[in-house]
Amino acid sequence: MESGHRFDAQTLHSFIQAVFRQMGSEEQEAKLVADHLIAANLAGHDSHGIGMIPSYVRSWSQGHLQINHHAKTVKEAGAAVTLDGDRAFGQVAAHEAMALGIEKAHQHGIAAVALHNSHHIGRIGYWAEQCAAAGFVSIHFVSVVGIPMVAPFHGRDSRFGTNPFCVVFPRKDNFPLLLDYATSAIAFGKTRVAWHKGVPVPPGCLIDVNGVPTTNPAVMQESPLGSLLTFAEHKGYALAAMCEILGGALSGGKTTHQETLQTSPDAILNCMTTIIINPELFGAPDCNAQTEAFAEWVKASPHDDDKPILLPGEWEVNTRRERQKQGIPLDAGSWQAICDAARQIGMPEETLQAFCQQLAS
């Protein structure tokens, strides 16, 4: 498959679902995982899309990822619930966690959901969008257990994960305002994408094993490994630390330290503490009008008419619209890695080639 090819999202979804069915996932699990990965690519976040499949296959083959498992309730107290993800697909455990949180927010006006010991939960904005679709605000603190990739401010090596932070605010008859980013300068997955493409990452994102700044993504993909830096120096570091504590420790999970280090970079275990709020709880009748007035005010001052000011989440909306029409782009290296993973789990070559023909058409 040549570099720069674009894939039809629906056909690609069928292929990805078939890959996980081949791995042994039940139909609903395979669908939930494919839904999430394709949605990440459509939103423009290829780092959290189908390029994760080889890592998931390795994690499963190493005994870390547990297929056909579900989130288990550890403690429930009114509007709060703690869940053990049981190393299930994060796309399953987080879906179940958000569904339960939304149900509690309907009942109580507010809910707190603590999820620990889940396999990789992917793009956090997806779970925020699930809450926004129900009409709720949500705030998410996420940690990555035992796979340090990010150096603290003034640090010389990795001490914690990319620890995403996410907030969503639903709007009436419009797309939700969505803040969703890793607390590292760039997501780890973006170094994988750059590495496959053979392109550098922006300055200020990486240091090598000796602590020297670099733009070469190979330092995060090949031994000896370097480190990501936090965004905005001390500010990103402080937010990452709070995500580690609120996402990891408060959820009943673990934080990253000597005793919790993982032996495999594919054993991606996430913890997430989520606050879900019904905006009607506050009795603010002008909330939507004030939100729209602010949005119009901000967007009315572009420096360059060819570069409009975007609201939080608007870039994803635009990218989704474009990719739904033109297809999902995928570089040759990522596609080859996905095909190799499909072969590794036993997908017959004729089945793989049949999908390749459909995707190439």
Swiss-Prot record:
GO terms for cellular component: cytosol. Pfam families: Ldh_2. NAD(+) binds at residues 48, 122-124, 178-182, 234, 270, 313-316. The keyword Cell cycle does not apply. InterPro entries: Mal/L-sulf/L-lact_DH-like_ah, Mal/L-sulf/L-lact_DH-like_NADP, Mal/L-sulfo/L-lacto_DH-like_sf, Malate/L-lactate_DH-like. One of its GO terms (molecular function) is hydroxyphenylpyruvate reductase activity. Keywords: NAD, NADP, Oxidoreductase. Belongs to the LDH2/MDH2 oxidoreductase family. Catalyzes the NAD(P)H-dependent reduction of 2-oxoglutarate, phenylpyruvate and (4-hydroxyphenyl)pyruvate, leading to the respective 2-hydroxycarboxylate in vitro. Shows a preference for NADPH over NADH as a redox partner. Do not catalyze the reverse reactions. This is Hydroxycarboxylate dehydrogenase B.
